[in-house]
Amino acid sequence: EDTELLAPIPNPWMVFSVGMNYGRHLAEMSNTPPPEHPSGFIKTRDSLLGSGKAIKVPPQCPDWIDYEGEFCFVFGRECHAVSEADAMEYVAGYTIANDVSARDWIPDIKKGEPPFGPIHGWERNILGKNLPGFTPCGPVIVTKDEIADPYDLHLQTRLNGEVMQDTKTDDLIFKLPEIISYYSQWYRFHPGDVVTTGSPAGVGIGRDPHVFMHAGDTIEIELEGVGVLSNTLS
């Protein structure tokens, strides 16, 4: 209890997030067929936060703060332009992240009114995930050899003790070799870079009525074989 946990990789070269990568989450958000290729975006290093740290509610977008519990992998070697067959050789281990998302402008995006056309809508969605402390990560990194099958892990997100997300990682649309091979065509990943593999179903924006986080709430994400990432909002 006296130990302060920082993000396991406090200053990676890159934090990369894959989006819409769980079948049931894709259905709850858009009900469209699975894409041909992965989709994703870069998050700032300043968004990283350790387990047990407080997620600060931003005054400019305080009302629609969402959770996204995600299974992550960490690179152990420099990786660029690799094949799917070789991709897992570059993975050092696994951890957990919460892709916290401020969604206050979602109603305007859905209206499609200026300045919220498709391009600006996507941009606002990504900006809402990049506020300081909006990528809690941890509590530890488990080495690759400690996880027999990364697609057979139980992932659960709890808000104030209530289960919000409850899934197995076998619902991933694009598995790790596909993600690594696809994005390494462009990016050069470095040791310590963190990749979040996408959120499962059960996010707050996908519920009716919506469920969002507020100051005083506690959000926990538990991944089988890794541990529990826990943060409060302040």
State what each model feature region is:
Residues 1-39, 156, 218-222:
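N-terminal non-catalytic cap/leader segment that marks the start of a structured domain
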Residues 13-16, 38-40, 46-47, 54, ...:
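Structural motif
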Residues 25, 56, 103-234:
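Catalytic-pocket segment enriched in acidic/His residues
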Residues 46, 51-103:
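Non-heme Fe(II) oxygenase catalytic core, chiefly the N-lobe of the double-stranded beta-helix
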